């Protein structure tokens, strides 16, 4: 099992919060992601669209992991402000793939 780290940034104040989370993927799924990165030269928006269209099952796994990590990061932020936690996000989250894959090519 290969572990893939997905990352993002949560901008809720002037500082913003970075987070990352590890997702376990089959080796074949990781190879498919690398293939997409190679084909598209590292354009993040294109990666997201191609991944969503070409490998929707992998995209779904990453999307859920990113959603949970964003929700966790947002709740940490709310707690630090003394505000109550929420159980769902009312703003957009994004699937961001790690640059380490892009650096390989």
Q: Where do the language-model regions lie?
A:
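A short beta-strand micro-motif
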Residues: 4-10
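Acidic, low-complexity, intrinsically disordered interaction modules
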Residues: 10-105
């Amino acid at each position: 099992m290969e572990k893939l780290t997905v990352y993002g940034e949560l901008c809720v104040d002037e500082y913003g919060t970075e987070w990352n989370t590890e997702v376990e993927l089959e080796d074949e799924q990781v190879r498919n992601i690398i293939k997409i990165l190679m084909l598209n030269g590292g354009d993040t928006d294109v990666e997201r669209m191609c991944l969503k269209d070409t490998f929707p099952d992998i995209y779904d796994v990453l999307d859920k992991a990113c959603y949970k990590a964003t929700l966790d990061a947002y709740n940490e932020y709310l707690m630090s402000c003394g505000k109550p936690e929420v159980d769902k996000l009312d703003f957009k989250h994004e699937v961001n793939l790690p640059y380490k894959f892009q650096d390989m090519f």
